[in-house]
Amino acid sequence: MDFIDEVKLYLKAGDGGDGCVSFRREKFVEFGGPNGGNGGKGGNIVFVSDANLNTLLNFRYRRHVKAGSGKSGASRDRSGTAGKNIVLKVPVGTQIIDEESEKIILDFNKPDMEFLIAQGGKGGLGNTNFKSSINRAPRHFTCGQFGEEKYVVLKLKVLSDVGIIGMPNAGKSKFLTRCSNADTKVGDYPFTTIKPHLGVAKVDNSEVVIVDIPGIITDAHLGIGLGHKFLKHVERCKILLHLIDVTHDNVVSAYNCMRNELELYNSDLVKKEEIIVLNKCDLLRKVEIFEKKNHLANYLNKEVLCLSIGEDLQPILRLLNEKLKKGSSKKVDVYDPFKR
């Protein structure tokens, strides 16, 4: 399934229906009064966050969204039918951004949030509303109001437990494929992954949501390569799983390159908890692996794990799950736009 994480939309709420000018035309009623009905209200456009969605694929061929307009009023004091509302479902983690001001209108950070983005126009008044003691046969009415219209940008920042980061060809996709139900492309060449992939790994009686971020290279924060477009997804991950190809000539340099790009993009990213893994350890001799592992561990003063291509992933997944449980016990302040 294609992963779409940014779309531009034109939104147009429905216009209100016009009021009606009408008079009673009944037998034996010589001076029938006004009976023109009001116009119907225009339809609204509403966004709703849906936990079952993980991409903006629904908007690939739907860039113009228009709600139904209200019908005009009719005789015998009949009001026009209201326009049909449009409900747009988006994944949790979607931001609605005003295209002109580039300001965030709303951040859908939890499921089942609703937001009225475009208000339908009010219906016009029929001539019945203008009847008075001095004007018993008014021919005045009002037109329906126009519905709101605006251009917005939807940006999806994937909400996941673990983000797999690393240089191109570090084995990220292979890891995700082996530990989850994700259908990712795996190849022995850089940039096999050109879009994020989500997977769910089962760990004992728990589930861990993992996202594979496309390979990030030097100057990714400036838009070089593929990384800049997808670095935003790292922001929503609780823990980073940093995979480093053990066959790299300098594992310290590979580590620093990745960390520098994260910090230059957003300094808060390097504050996230990180598990470091030297991957593809079956491709080197044990002596070489031991040397590189100690070199990196001593440089960082952190624990460094090793992983072979065919090795059991459960120990690493259990470690991730334990850290997630510890992190969930901490109170985290989440912005709630509906809280007063």
UniProtKB/Swiss-Prot annotation:
GTP binds at residues 166-173, 191-195, 212-215, 279-282, 310-312. Mg(2+) binds at S173, T193. Signal peptide: none annotated. Pfam families: GTP1_OBG (PF01018), MMR_HSR1 (PF01926). InterPro entries: G_OBG (IPR031167), GTP-bd (IPR006073), GTP-bd_Obg/CgtA (IPR014100), GTP1_OBG_dom (IPR006169), GTP1_OBG_dom_sf (IPR036726), OBG_GTPase (IPR045086), P-loop_NTPase (IPR027417). Residues 160-329 form the OBG-type G domain. Its main location: cytoplasm. Residues 1-159 form the Obg domain. Keywords: Cytoplasm, GTP-binding, Hydrolase, Magnesium, Metal-binding, Nucleotide-binding. Disulfide bonds: none annotated. It is found in: Cytoplasm. It is an enzyme of class 3 (hydrolase). An essential GTPase which binds GTP, GDP and possibly (p)ppGpp with moderate affinity, with high nucleotide exchange rates and a fairly low GTP hydrolysis rate. Plays a role in control of the cell cycle, stress response, ribosome biogenesis and in those bacteria that undergo differentiation, in morphogenesis control. Belongs to the TRAFAC class OBG-HflX-like GTPase superfamily. OBG GTPase family. This is GTPase Obg. It comes from Wolbachia sp. subsp. Brugia malayi (strain TRS). The lineage of its organism: Bacteria, Pseudomonadati, Pseudomonadota, Alphaproteobacteria, Rickettsiales.
